[in-house]
């Protein structure tokens, strides 16, 4: 694989600050770009939002976003320009040839992204032009679907499609502004062009409370960033590849891996929260009114903090983490596969798309495979617990305080321990790295899944079949008694007649 060298703008001050605080200069640029969303929001609200000419708004967003992109990636900014221009001209030429347009648009963007991954890939996460480009790929693919949905009759569209369909293609300047939106192009979130247009047209401006909500999100993001940095200082990734980790007691190993996974997760959460705070401050994220009649500014939220911190299962993590991207995949991939008439295949295809979208590393594919297997197993366990355990022992268990305490501890322990297993491959990426960590914890994740599958299917085969057989015998006995009773009554009936 070719060695990649990035052509970034030289900045001695940035290099000096980065070395002084002990972080890579690329990471410092990324953080500063995310934080730049707040002064950009202040400038827009103070000077630009009151200007009637919408062209000025589009120029402001396109210019700020492209400038911040250049600050991070230098001349590699041209990759995003190629992507935007390609989709723009494809719309001009092929919009009414729906299937051809969608196929070319999808294949072009995914192929370009995968080629980018191929030429820039390494053993670690790299803050290169491919990072914002993967966000842009989803935006351009989703935009393509919205354009073609605009050609359909209203009756042919789903509720989601009605909210995002575009009857009229935007201008090139509008598309550039939408694509380079300052607080949305780098790490997400995804939002449709219709939301951007409504925002620029002032449809959200009369609603209050966005600045306060944005500041709260900023505070949460700063808190998670601090916890992440402190936690990973004590539990760095490299520690889990060492012989010292493998020599720790098994229970301590799996708990250390679980807490490390939490801290690693907070790295992404902090970036999303800081970005969301800037988007809220600028006023893009209005969702409607909450149950108390107050403005709800969570329209671009990418994480559900309450569910993330109080959830007990991997499914809770899936529902609370990277919410915005999951919603995008649900709307533009999963639901578009409805013609397959099989939810399992559609779900598997959606997870496969997410894995490919992340890159070539085997860790991504193992992560999404584990997600599928673990969530499926959790559903089986829930079904077994509610259908088998509770009907027989529920009256005892539900009245026991000791059981309730043990139940809580078990779920929380599972939550921490299995999070470590599931996130290992995602962080270490390469097979030769994540398999070392799996081996160091004795492959406990695989072991549990195999043991549960053996038990569950054995139970279904023997106990369920015997239960059905017993139920059938009971029914036959009941039918026999009923017939006998009928026969005994017949003479009496004849006498009465």
Swiss-Prot record:
Please name the catalytic residues of this protein. Answer: 322, 358
- In terms of domain of life, where is this protein from? Eukaryota
User: Which InterPro entries does this chain map to?
Assistant: LPLAT_7/PORCN-like (IPR049941), MBOAT_fam (IPR004299)
State if Nucleus is listed as a keyword: no
Statement: the UniProt record of this protein carries the keyword Ion transport:
no
Q: Enumerate the UniProt keywords alphabetically.
A: Acyltransferase, Endoplasmic reticulum, Glycoprotein, Lipid biosynthesis, Lipid metabolism, Membrane, Phospholipid biosynthesis, Phospholipid metabolism, Phosphoprotein, Transferase, Transmembrane, Transmembrane helix
Q: What is its EC number?
A: 2.3.1.23, 2.3.1.n6
Tissues/organs with expression: During gastrulation, expressed mainly along the midline in the presumptive mesoderm. During germ band elongation, expressed in mesoderm and endoderm primordia and in the cephalic furrow. Expression in mesoderm and endoderm lineages continues during germ band shortening. At the end of this process, no longer detected in somatic mesoderm or endoderm layer with expression restricted to anterior and posterior domains of the visceral mesoderm.
- Role played: Acyltransferase that mediates the acylation of lysophospholipids to produce phospholipids (glycerophospholipids). Highest activity with lysophosphatidylcholine (1-acyl-sn-glycero-3-phosphocholine or LPC) producing phosphatidylcholine (1,2-diacyl-sn-glycero-3-phosphocholine or PC) (LPCAT activity), but also converts lysophosphatidylserine (1-acyl-2-hydroxy-sn-glycero-3-phospho-L-serine or LPS) to phosphatidylserine (1,2-diacyl-sn-glycero-3-phospho-L-serine or PS) (LPSAT activity).
Q: What's a GO biological-process term for it?
A: lipid modification
Q: Which PANTHER family match?
A: LYSOPHOSPHOLIPID ACYLTRANSFERASE 5 (PTHR13906:SF14), PORCUPINE (PTHR13906)
Catalysed conversion reaction: a 1-acyl-sn-glycero-3-phospho-L-serine + an acyl-CoA = a 1,2-diacyl-sn-glycero-3-phospho-L-serine + CoA; 1-(9Z-octadecenoyl)-sn-glycero-3-phospho-L-serine + (9Z)-hexadecenoyl-CoA = 1-(9Z-octadecenoyl)-2-(9Z-hexadecenoyl)-sn-glycero-3-phospho-L-serine + CoA; a 1-acyl-sn-glycero-3-phosphocholine + an acyl-CoA = a 1,2-diacyl-sn-glycero-3-phosphocholine + CoA; 1-hexadecanoyl-sn-glycero-3-phosphocholine + (9Z)-octadecenoyl-CoA = 1-hexadecanoyl-2-(9Z-octadecenoyl)-sn-glycero-3-phosphocholine + CoA
Q: Which GO terms describe its cellular component?
A: endoplasmic reticulum; membrane
Positions modified as Phosphoserine?
Answer: 480
Source organism (scientific name):
Drosophila melanogaster
Composition bias of kind Basic and acidic residues appears in 470-497
Q: What is its main location?
A: endoplasmic reticulum
Output this protein's name: Lysophospholipid acyltransferase 5
Q: In which pathway does it act?
A: Lipid metabolism; phospholipid metabolism
Gene this chain is encoded by: nes
Location of the protein in the cell: Endoplasmic reticulum; Membrane
One MF term in GO for this entry?
1-acylglycerophosphocholine O-acyltransferase activity
Sugar-bearing residue positions: 398
Membrane topology annotation: Multi-pass membrane protein
Where would you find the membrane-spanning parts of this chain? Answer: 31-51, 74-94, 100-120, 173-193, 213-235, 264-286, 339-361, 408-428, 435-455
């Amino acid at each position: 694989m070719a060695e990649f060298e990035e052509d970034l703008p030289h900045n001695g001050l940035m290099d000096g600050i980065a070395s002084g605080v002990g972080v890579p200069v690329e990471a410092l640029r990324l953080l500063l770009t995310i934080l730049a969303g707040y002064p950009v929001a202040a400038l827009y609200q103070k000077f630009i939002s009151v200007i009637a000419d919408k062209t000025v708004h589009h120029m402001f967003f396109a210019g700020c976003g492209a400038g911040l992109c250049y600050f991070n990636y230098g001349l590699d900014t041209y990759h995003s320009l190629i992507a935007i221009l390609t989709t723009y001209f494809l719309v001009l030429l092929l919009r009414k040839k729906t299937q051809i347009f969608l196929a070319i648009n999808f294949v072009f963007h995914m192929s370009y992204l995968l080629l980018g991954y191929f030429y820039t890939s390494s053993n670690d996460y790299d803050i290169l032009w491919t990072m914002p480009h993967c966000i842009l790929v989803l935006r351009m693919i989703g935009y393509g679907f919205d354009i073609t949905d605009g050609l359909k009759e209203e009756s042919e569209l789903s509720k989601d499609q009605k909210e995002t369909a575009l009857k009229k293609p935007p201008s090139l300047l509008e598309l550039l502004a939408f694509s380079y939106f300052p607080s949305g192009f780098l790490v997400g979130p995804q939002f449709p062009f219709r939301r951007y247009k409504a925002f620029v047209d002032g449809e959200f401006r009369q609603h209050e409370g966005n600045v306060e909500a944005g500041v709260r999100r900023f505070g949460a993001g700063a808190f998670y960033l601090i916890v992440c940095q402190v936690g990973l200082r004590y539990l760095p990734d490299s520690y889990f590849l060492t012989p010292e980790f493998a020599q720790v007691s098994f229970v301590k190993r799996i708990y250390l891996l679980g807490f490390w996974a939490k801290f690693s997760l907070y790295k992404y959460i902090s970036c999303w929260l800081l970005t969301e705070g800037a988007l809220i401050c600028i006023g893009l994220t209005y969702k409607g009114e909450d149950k108390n009649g107050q403005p709800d500014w969570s329209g671009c939220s990418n994480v559900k903090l309450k569910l993330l911190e109080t959830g007990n299962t991997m499914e809770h993590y899936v529902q609370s983490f990277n919410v915005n991207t999951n919603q995008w995949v649900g709307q533009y991939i999963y639901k578009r596969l409805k013609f397959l008439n099989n939810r399992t295949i559609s779900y598997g295809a959606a997870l496969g798309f997410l894995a490919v979208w992340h890159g070539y590393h085997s860790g991504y594919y193992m992560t999404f495979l584990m997600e599928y297997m673990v969530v499926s197993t959790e559903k089986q366990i829930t079904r077994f617990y509610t259908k088998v355990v509770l009907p027989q022992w529920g009256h005892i268990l539900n009245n026991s305080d000791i059981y309730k305490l043990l139940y809580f501890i078990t779920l929380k322990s599972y939550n921490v321990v299995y999070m470590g297993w599931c996130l290992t491959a995602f962080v270490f990426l390469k097979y030769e790295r994540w398999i070392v960590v799996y081996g160091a914890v004795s492959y406990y994740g695989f072991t549990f899944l195999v043991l549960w599958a053996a038990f569950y299917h054995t139970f279904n085969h023997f106990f369920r079949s015997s239960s059905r057989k017993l139920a059938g015998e009971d029914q036959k006995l009941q039918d026999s008694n009923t017939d006998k009773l009928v026969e005994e009554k017949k003479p009496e009936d004849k006498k009465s007649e």
